[in-house]
Amino acid sequence: DAQALSLLSRVGPVLMQQQIVANQVVYEANSLNMQLKANSAEALQTLTQQLNQQGFQVELGNIQPTTGGAIGMVKIQ
C-alpha cells in the first residue's frame, strides 16, 4: 500500500535518529501500529512529541520496562 510506504518513509528517519528499533509493524485502517524498542521510556515519549510536531497523529500505548530499555506500542496516523 502506497500510504503505508509513505508513512514508513517519513517515520523511519525519526526512529533511526532516536536509536529506536521497530520489533513489529502492522498497517491497518490507515494507521501504522508499531511495537518499538528504545533505550528508555523517555525516548518513546520524545519520539511521540517529535512525530506530533511533524503533523502526525500519534498515540503512545503501553510501555514495558525491559533490560536495557523499554518496549512501547505506538499508533501513527
Regions inferred by a protein language model and the residue ranges of each:
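Periplasmic/lumenal scaffold domains of single-pass inner-membrane subunits
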Residues: 2-77
